[in-house]
Amino acid sequence: MPVVTDLNGILAPGMLVRHPEYPEWGLGQVQSNIGGMITVNFREEGKKVIDGARIALLPVFDP
């Protein structure tokens, strides 16, 4: 299992992210971040719930 930094802890609703393993999902907007489970609505894939302990989402500051 990859080592995940605590960067997911800063993700808040409205922030933009990308999934590091699925760039084809496109830009995603964080819907919620509760107990390390991050709900993201991806432009090309729809709504996904990401386990923040396993996947380090990539924040996007300048889309």
Regions found by a protein language model. Name each.
Residues 1-16, 24:
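Mixed-charge, Lys/Arg-rich low-complexity intrinsically disordered regions
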Residues 1-3, 47-63:
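Intrinsically disordered, low-complexity, charged/polar segments
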Residues 26-32:
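Short beta-strand-centered aromatic/proline hotspots
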Residues 33, 43:
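Short, loop-centered acidic/histidine patches that primarily coordinate divalent metals
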Residues 38-42:
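SH3/SH3-like beta-barrel fold
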